């Protein structure tokens, strides 16, 4: 055989396309597709990759898993450009569109609706003639849903920013350990604790803030005013107040709650002040999140714990030391604070409160509380909190309301039986109407720089709404009309005036919610406020034809919808209103139609509320 026959034949020169493929294969790939990861193959990166094409399988590449700096920056730039383009297109739509299309959508957006809810409203609730005139809006909503399909954009970061991008820092520092095993970040725990004491605690005041923070800073598990149970459930509830949390911290909210329940079971019936307070927050969380059975169990445990603690405090020997005496005072304040919260829940449930009024009167300070309140996380200079003044006023209001139990907690329908009022009920009605006039200057309804003062007045008007709504349906016997104040006498003797007083208070609740939203946003209201909003909505339901009542109903529905983004309970209440409106053949304002839609159901299963053609009024 000639030598030439032994030489190997050279391969042909690579074509341009083959060279390009080879170059792609040699390119560094930051992350592989899911199929290549599962089969442990080298991936070419760009979907569809060569392996998936060869195997004829779907190629799925999660680009967010690529943690290289260039990839992260590129995704961030693309996201910002997409948001800028989306904002410009929405502004153009609102600028050029008429009120028939824009105002209901604007009201829905203001209620913190998610992109799928907005798209569902446009595709299934917006009249077909208007949808065909605004195809660009349909396209915008599709882009929104595509952008959010893998990574939802948070509505608001935990550190909300002001227009100039500044934010405040928490004015306390507490350790995560040894109080919680869920997270170890002291800074995040401090922010959540301060957030809860900023927005929830002033109105739901049954924890001594200063002693709790002092003991939490100490890190001692034998502390008298702090415990892991109490810390974990406060952290869980604080996550509800911090809307727009990242997904990982949203899951931590559930873990905090489950950890608190585990720690409660570990107590095995032992009762202490932090345990009772932790039960109080657990009960609040279970109620607002729709866990009715858990709420009933926690409420029963809470009532028993408070009775046991109160008996121990009342039986202190006269030679008890200062710490024991201080603890007894704080137990009494805790009892009153939880009674106040129980009355708010009982008002809407129309049931007697699970906690009876404490036997000992609340401790009253003759000096105004000069502690400062800051609208964290937004930067603010701070205003005097007046927390102790508000606590005293709330206790006085609930003592009055408790004496009107027949009005507040009755579940009877309209009755023709004559209603005989006792002297105690007449006195309570007089005190209820005079309560607001006797408040100190720092708690007047015109004070709009403290959200908890607004919540207090919402609650007062909710009581008035329910009481006068009850009186309008029952004939009364008033043996001595001159003994009553003019307002009470007119309401008692004229059902029409009683109903007018009820609607007036409902409209005032709507006004206060607008003030709160303008100053701090709807998603900063404490969960207990939703009961006041729902009481006003049910009162206004039969009178939405009146323009003033109509506007109030729209703003209250938007506020309730904002609550439903954070908790489950308002969702069921809104559906209840929707069903009652259908049963009574009530035509609801069309501006509220979007708030009652369920975006998880297809359009064929949704039953729209009867409404007239909207000219619309935006929620200002």
Swiss-Prot record:
A GO MF label: zinc ion binding
Biological source species: Aspergillus versicolor
Gene3D superfamilies attached to this UniProt entry: Zn(2)-C6 fungal-type DNA-binding domain
Chief place where the protein resides: nucleus
Chain spans, region Disordered: 1-26, 591-620
GO CC, any one term: nucleus
Residues annotated as signal peptide: none
Function: Transcription factor that probably regulates the expression of the gene cluster that mediates the biosynthesis of notoamide, a fungal indole alkaloid that belongs to a family of natural products containing a characteristic bicyclo[2.2.2]diazaoctane core.
Entry-linked SUPFAM superfamilies: Zn2/Cys6 DNA-binding domain
Protein name according to UniProt: Notoamide biosynthesis transcriptional activator notL'
Gene: notL'
SMART domains: GAL4
BP terms from Gene Ontology: DNA-templated transcription
Feature: DNA-binding region: 33-59
Keywords from the UniProt entry: DNA-binding, Metal-binding, Nucleus, Transcription, Transcription regulation, Zinc
């Amino acid at each position: 055989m000639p030598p030439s026959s032994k030489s190997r034949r050279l391969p042909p020169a690579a074509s341009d396309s083959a060279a390009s493929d080879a170059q792609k294969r040699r390119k560094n790939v930051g992350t592989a597709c899911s199929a290549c990861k599962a089969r442990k193959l080298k991936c070419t990166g760009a979907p569809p990759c060569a392996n998936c094409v060869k195997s004829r399988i779907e190629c799925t590449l999660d680009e967010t898993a690529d943690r290289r700096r260039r990839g992260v920056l590129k995704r961030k730039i693309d996201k910002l450009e997409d948001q800028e383009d989306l904002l410009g297109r929405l502004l153009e739509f609102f600028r050029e569109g008429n009120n028939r299309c824009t105002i209901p959508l604007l009201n829905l957006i203001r209620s913190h609706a998610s992109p799928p809810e907005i798209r569902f409203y446009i595709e299934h609730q917006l009249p077909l003639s208007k949808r065909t005139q605004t195809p660009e809006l349909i396209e915008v909503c599709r882009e929104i849903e595509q952008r959010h399909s893998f990574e939802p954009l948070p509505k608001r970061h935990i550190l909300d920013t002001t227009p100039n991008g500044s934010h405040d820092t928490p004015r306390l520092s507490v350790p995560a350990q040894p109080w919680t095993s869920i997270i170890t970040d002291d800074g995040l725990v401090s922010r959540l604790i301060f957030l809860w004491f900023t927005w929830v605690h002033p109105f739901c005041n049954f924890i001594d803030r200063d002693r709790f923070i002092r003991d939490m800073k100490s890190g001692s598990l034998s502390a008298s005013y702090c415990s892991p149970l109490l810390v974990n459930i406060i952290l869980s509830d604080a996550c509800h107040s911090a809307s727009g949390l990242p997904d990982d911290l949203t899951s931590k909210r559930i873990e905090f709650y489950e950890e608190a329940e585990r720690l409660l079971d570990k107590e095995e019936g032992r009762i202490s002040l932090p345990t009772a307070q932790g039960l109080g927050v657990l009960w609040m969380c279970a109620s607002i999140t729709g866990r009715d059975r858990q709420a009933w169990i926690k409420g029963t445990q809470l009532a028993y714990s408070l009775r046991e603690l109160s008996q121990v405090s009342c039986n202190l020997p006269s030679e008890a030391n200062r710490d024991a005496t201080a603890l007894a005072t704080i137990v009494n304040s805790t009892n009153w604070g939880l009674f106040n919260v129980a009355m708010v829940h009982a008002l809407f449930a129309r049931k007697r409160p699970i906690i009876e009024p404490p036997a000992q009167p609340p401790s009253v300070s003759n000096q105004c509380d000069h502690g400062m309140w800051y609208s964290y996380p937004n930067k603010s200079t701070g205003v005097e909190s007046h927390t102790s003044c508000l606590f005293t006023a709330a206790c006085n209001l609930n003592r009055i309301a408790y004496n009107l139990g027949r009005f507040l907690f009755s579940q009877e329908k309209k009755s023709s039986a004559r209603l005989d009022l006792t002297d105690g009920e007449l006195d309570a009605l007089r005190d209820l109407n005079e309560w607001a006039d006797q408040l100190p200057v720092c708690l007047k309804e015109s004070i709009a720089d403290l959200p908890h003062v607004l919540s207090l007045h919402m609650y007062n008007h909710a009581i008035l709404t329910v009481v006068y709504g009850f009186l309008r349906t029952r004939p009364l016997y008033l043996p001595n009309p001159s003994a009553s104040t003019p307002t009470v006498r007119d309401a008692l003797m004229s059902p029409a005036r009683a109903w007018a007083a009820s609607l007036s208070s409902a409209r005032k609740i709507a006004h206060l919610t607008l003030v709160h939203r303008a100053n701090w946003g709807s998603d900063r209201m404490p969960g207990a406020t939703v009961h006041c909003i729902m009481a006003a909505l049910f009162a206004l339901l039969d009178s939405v034809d009146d323009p003033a009542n109509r506007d109030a109903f729209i703003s209250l529905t938007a506020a309730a919808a904002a609550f439903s983004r954070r908790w489950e309970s308002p969702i069921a209440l809104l559906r209840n209103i929707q069903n009652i409106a259908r049963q009574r053949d009530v035509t609801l304002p069309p501006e509220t139609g979007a708030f009652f839609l369920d975006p998880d159901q297809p359009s064929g299963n949704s039953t729209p509320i009867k409404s007239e053609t909207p000219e619309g009024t935006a929620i200002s």
